[in-house]
Amino acid sequence: MSNLDYKQFTERHRPHIQPPDSIIFVTYRLAGSIPRATVREYKARRVWLEDQGTHIKNKLRRNKSPEAKRWLEQVEKFKREWFVKFEEIMHSANTGPMWMKDQRVADIVAAGLQKLDGDAYRLDAYSVMSNHVHAVFKPFLSGNDLIEGLKEGRPIFTSEHPGLSRIMHSLKGSSARECNLVLSRVGQFWEHESFDHVIREGKFYRTIRYVLNNPVKAGLVNQWGEWRWNYCRIELIDKL
């Protein structure tokens, strides 16, 4: 079986399931592409937010209290602010790894995204840049796909489709091995953490345009279609 075949999950590791029909915008980057001091600041603030969430866990489950609502708003604001900050750093970077400048490496990363199209997700768009990748896709896994059972007295969940964390593990793992081989290097290739969020209603085409225009914004091409490592699902092109 491939690493995306039939899966088993314990209760503790039950996959995070997005709302039905959710479309995900994800950004993942090379290890070391953001200065360590910036990463430390980000992680410290994230831990603080997580601690606040632990204190109001029961309220968050009900999602009704003003305190829980304020915390969720803080989380969304935090994610937006740091996404923008990381983007600015990566686009203006003149130091740090830029392995995808090597066409062989960029081709491997793009091929990995294409490989899971129709298997783990419906791929809508991606852009492979020198030190990071943007992708938009719709995972096939939903809450209705999970089958609950027992194994050695413990609850488990099985599904034919991988969750988001498993998708990212597959994308990063296989491409990291191939890219390191091409580059004759060893060590961590991708940063472990990725940015991801569900695209809100009415923001889909705006997000697609943002992804595809990354190389245009960086001054690498004049039109997004000129960038070899851009992809857009053909049904969407006329609507951009």
PLM segments and residue spans:
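Short catalytic/metal-binding and nucleic-acid-binding patches
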Residues: 1-240
